[in-house]
Amino acid sequence: DIESNLLNYPEEVFPKPKNADEDLPPVARSFLQQAMDTIHAPDAAAVMAGSAVDAMLKEKGLRKGSLYERIDSALDQNILTQGMADWAHEVRLGSNRPRHADEENPHVTTEQAQQSVDFAEALGNFLFVLTAKIERGIQAAQEEKS
């Protein structure tokens, strides 16, 4: 019967799965979503978080040079603060270890991967999501005046 069958399915998943914000550029959003979805596989999550950061900087027009150079360029252009650039370099280094199979320390911990994912999400919020929300708020206020 249907009622007993429904009892075999969870009503809710805990913790709730996270979704990358729709206001992120598509490539960055895809990488960030993969990072969120693979946090149980820390090396994969760290690599995807690093790729999300890379895609975000490219979306901001920083396409030349290595990711290291692009992070420094973002700092020089005031796209990132010093603290954000420092954290971005940590994410870059963390994603490089599994990506390049570092011989001495190839893996990241779950905590390190989570920090990388958190940074990529925070960077996306700072560079894209907050800006989109502000633009929508301004537009809504202007429409109310009309």
Model-based region annotation:
Residues H40, L57-L62, N125-F128, A132:
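Hydrophobic/aromatic-lined pockets within catalytic cores
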Residues N5-E11, G61-G94:
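Short, charged amphipathic alpha-helical segments flanked by flexible coils
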Residues P17-D21, P25, P42-A46, T81-A88, ...:
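Amphipathic, non-membrane alpha-helical segments in soluble helical-bundle scaffolds
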Residues D43-R63:
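Hydrophobic alpha-helical packing segments in soluble, helical-rich domains
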Residues D86-L93, R97-S146:
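Charge-enriched, short contiguous segments at helix-coil
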Residues D1-D43, K145-S146:
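Charged alpha-helical initiation segments
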Residues P26, S30-Q33, S51-D54, E69, ...:
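Generic structural signal for well-ordered, non-membrane alpha-helices
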Residues Q34-D37, A41, K58, S73-Q77, ...:
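General structural signal for alpha-helix termini and helix-helix connectors
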